[in-house]
């Protein structure tokens, strides 16, 4: 039934797009920024948008809508996508940050340039065509109906090291993968903003000023909008019993899809700051990062601060998802599979890891100048101003 409905929707979208393309010209001053991940501009989009907005001759259309639960929510989201076809058919540049169904089921106009600015920085966990027929990936049968990640003209990545992996994941040629830098990394070069964030945090939590603040940001375990299993595999109560009296505090930040599955209680050791601070603000505030398989490690490496990898389910994750690199030798920090080992890692002085983090950062984030948003915006503008293919 689901396959039948997908075919119907694909046919309707394709026909509507063809009709719009036949009737309407491409508007060479129009850029569309679209995402199903957020209801507003994300950190990655915001910097690019602000740069583009400086040119008053450009027309910028924002298409943001999350899919709500239930039949009505899905129907409303589908209607939103259908209405978006007008903008897809008339824009010169389409900028995305994730999976975008309408683009994959229409015969994209040659004059339209589709650019994928993937939401994750760097190539870490496998995705796209790298995990076909795996639990987290598309099935071969689905790809016959919906060729996901098709119709991209370019993808933008953080470094040359990521190029072959994104080419594999999107089934693109390497020359189409451009290491211009990831716009949201510009955050770490806005020193005045970071100072303001730190001052405001210490005013809000003066008791934490002299404590060691550990940011816990576990990866989203699931596909689509659905979290699989426990959102916080780390036993925070056990961690508290070991570290609470040693001037540590844990700041929790969860992926939006993970919140309803989280079983945490705030106290003087664990603070869930997901709704209060952005992930990047918490990175700047923190003294160290605890994570597992999150691509946040790329951005965090810019801070040159310790990272601890708590991975009790590593073997299972390798089977279900896998990575583009051998996990143990790739991550720039100690790996633990139980809380006592994690505590030992946190309390140890890992001088060697500081050098590893520096090397990791230089390899996987080439542009460390705070100008990635500008480079991406300039690349987009080159199509909007020239009007050429």
Curated annotation (Swiss-Prot):
The processes (GO biological process) annotated in the record are: cell wall organization; teichoic acid biosynthetic process
From the UniProt record, list the reaction(s) this protein catalyses: 4-O-[(2R)-glycerylphospho]-N-acetyl-beta-D-mannosaminyl-(1->4)-N-acetyl-alpha-D-glucosaminyl di-trans,octa-cis-undecaprenyl diphosphate + CDP-L-ribitol = 4-O-[1-D-ribitylphospho-(2R)-1-glycerylphospho]-N-acetyl-beta-D-mannosaminyl-(1->4)-N-acetyl-alpha-D-glucosaminyl di-trans,octa-cis-undecaprenyl diphosphate + CMP + H(+)
The highest taxon in the source lineage is Bacteria
Membrane protein topology class:
Peripheral membrane protein
Query: What EC number is given for this enzyme?
Result: 2.7.8.46
**GO CC term, one of those recorded:** plasma membrane
InterPro entries in UniProt: Glycerophosphate_synth, TagF_C, TagF_N, Teichoic_Acid_Biosynth
What's the gene? tarK
Report the source organism: Bacillus spizizenii (strain ATCC 23059 / NRRL B-14472 / W23) (Bacillus subtilis subsp. spizizenii)
Q: What name has this protein been given in UniProt?
A: Teichoic acid ribitol-phosphate primase
């Amino acid at each position: 039934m689901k396959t039948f409905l997908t075919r119907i929707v694909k046919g309707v979208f394709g026909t509507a797009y063809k009709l719009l393309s036949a009737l309407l010209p491409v508007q060479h001053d129009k850029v569309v920024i679209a995402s199903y991940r957020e209801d507003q501009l994300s950190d990655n989009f915001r910097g690019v948008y602000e740069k583009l907005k400086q040119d008053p001759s450009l027309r910028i259309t924002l298409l943001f809508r999350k899919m709500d639960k239930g039949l009505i929510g899905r129907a409303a989201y589908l209607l939103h996508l259908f209405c978006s076809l007008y903008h897809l058919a008339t824009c010169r540049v389409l900028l995305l940050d994730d999976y975008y169904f309408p683009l994959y089921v229409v015969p994209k106009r040659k004059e339209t340039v589709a650019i994928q600015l993937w939401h994750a920085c760097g190539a870490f966990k496998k995705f796209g065509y790298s995990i076909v027929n795996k639990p987290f990936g598309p099935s071969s049968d689905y790809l016959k109906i919906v060729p996901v990640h098709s119709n991209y003209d370019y993808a933008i990545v953080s470094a040359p090291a990521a190029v072959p992996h994104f080419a594999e994941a999107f089934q693109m040629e390497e020359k189409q993968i451009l290491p211009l830098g990831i716009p949201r990394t510009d955050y770490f070069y806005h020193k005045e903003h970071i100072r303001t964030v730190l001052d405001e945090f210490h005013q809000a939590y003066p008791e934490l000023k002299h404590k060691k603040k550990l940011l816990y940001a576990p990866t989203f375990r699931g596909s689509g909008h659905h979290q699989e299993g426990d959102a916080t595999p780390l036993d925070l109560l056990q961690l508290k019993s070991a570290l609470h009296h040693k001037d540590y505090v844990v700041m929790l930040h969860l992926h939006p899809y993970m919140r309803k599955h989280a079983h945490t209680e705030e106290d003087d050791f664990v603070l869930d700051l997901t709704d209060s601070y952005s992930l990047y603000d918490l990175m700047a505030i923190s003294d160290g990062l605890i994570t597992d398989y999150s691509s946040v490690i790329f951005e965090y490496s810019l801070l040159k601060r310790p990272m601890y990898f708590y991975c009790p389910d590593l073997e299972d994750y390798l089977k279900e998802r896998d990575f583009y690199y051998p996990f143990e030798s790739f991550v720039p920090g100690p790996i633990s599979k139980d809380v006592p080992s994690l505590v030992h890692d946190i309390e140890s002085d890992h001088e060697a890891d500081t050098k590893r983090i520096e090397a990791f950062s230089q390899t996987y984030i080439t542009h460390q100048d705070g100008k990635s948003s500008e480079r991406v915006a300039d690349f987009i503008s080159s199509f909007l101003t020239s009007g050429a293919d």
